[in-house]
Regions:
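N-terminal amphipathic alpha-helix/helix-capping segment at the start of soluble metabolic enzymes
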Residues: 1-24, 93
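Catalytic domains of carbohydrate-active enzymes, especially glycoside hydrolases
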Residues: 42-66
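N-terminal binding-site loop/beta-alpha segment at the start of enzyme catalytic domains
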Residues: 11, 20-39
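Glycine-rich, proline-tolerant flexible connector loops at the mouths of alpha/beta enzymes
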Residues: 33, 59-83, 104-116
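Non-globular sequence segments
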Residues: 94, 99, 105-131
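Glycine-rich anion/phosphate-binding loops
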Residues: 31-49, 75-95, 113-115
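Hydrophobic faces of well-ordered beta-strands that scaffold small-molecule active sites
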Residues: 20-23, 58-60, 100-104
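Conserved, mostly hydrophobic/aromatic
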Residues: 22, 50, 54, 93, ...
Length: 131
């Protein structure tokens, strides 16, 4: 009944070993990094374990695309300095037989938990006092 689930699939030239896809889950492991926004060895181990367990594709958690609004404890790819960490994660998951993708994110009001992050929203209406 679920034979197709475990068959390889090609998506625009990339082959996944099966159709098991892990959706993005917030681990907040980046909070343990020096700047609070980088890939950590613990995050890499988390994704490698899931690839070894059989996932064809792991979606890495929300990843900020804008430096001023990247809150502490969330991954960022807003600056080139983050590329090496993502490459290390990607290479490790490939070595374990899986693939990765990331969920790009501009946090909007969700970044309000970090007083240092700039809140960006798509309008010029005043924010409520809680923000």
């Amino acid at each position: 009944m679920f034979d197709k689930l475990f068959e390889p699939i090609q998506i625009r030239g990339m082959e996944l070993r099966n159709r098991v896809v892990m959706s993005a889950m917030g681990t907040h492991e980046s909070a343990e990094s020096e700047d609070g926004k980088s890939v950590t060895d613990k995050l890499i181990a988390y994704h490698v374990a899931r690839a070894k367990g059989g996932n064809g594709l792991n979606t890495v958690e929300v990843t900020s695309v804008d430096a001023p609004s990247a809150p502490f404890g969330f991954l960022s790819i807003a600056e080139d300095k983050y590329i090496a960490g993502f490459k290390k994660l990607n290479d490790a998951v490939h070595e374990a037989g899986g693939k990765t993708c990331i969920q790009l994110w501009q946090g909007g009001l969700a970044v309000a938990s970090d007083q240092m992050a700039q809140i960006l929203v798509p309008n010029d209406l005043p924010l409520s006092p809680q923000y």
